[in-house]
Amino acid sequence: ETHMALAMFEAGGLGIIHRYNTMKEQCLLVRDIAQILEDTSSTNINNIAAAIGTSSDFLQRAQGLVECGVKILCIDVAHGHHVLVEKSLKTLRDFFGERVTIIAGNVATPEAYRDLADWGADGVRIGIGGGSICSTRIQTGHGMPTLQSILDCRDSADAAIIADGGIRTSGDIVKALAAGSDMV
């Protein structure tokens, strides 16, 4: 994971440490990345990111990650427009204020995008079921093309739009950005 995050930084992207580690493992990865970025005088030192869920320990995990050097928290769930995401976003925003950037998602409708922004998300991952490995659309019967979701959401709120899923070619990246996504 360290190598992937560093490669993402080097390519101008954002490497997010996934949430399927223990908090201790996540913190060790974050510290490793921070040390490497510090040693190389990288400007990405302020872009260290890690994912969390919405389970009962989400705030404890978020606090630990921020203490380890995380500047960006990503609430990573398959469908982000539900009460646990609302509770998590509001709690994180109240606890951290503006000193932590919060990304949440995934959603596919203007209403959901607006709600996540209103609940405190700085960035919202747009797209459900478009990824090559994603089974959400099949399992839930819910999903829509990422490009259409971006077009529908782009004028609904001020949070950054992050196109997530359904991006397979460089042309898909260009289309997502042209449609209103702030990042892919």
Regions found by a protein language model. Give the residues of each.
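Alpha/beta enzyme core
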Residues: 2-164, 168-183
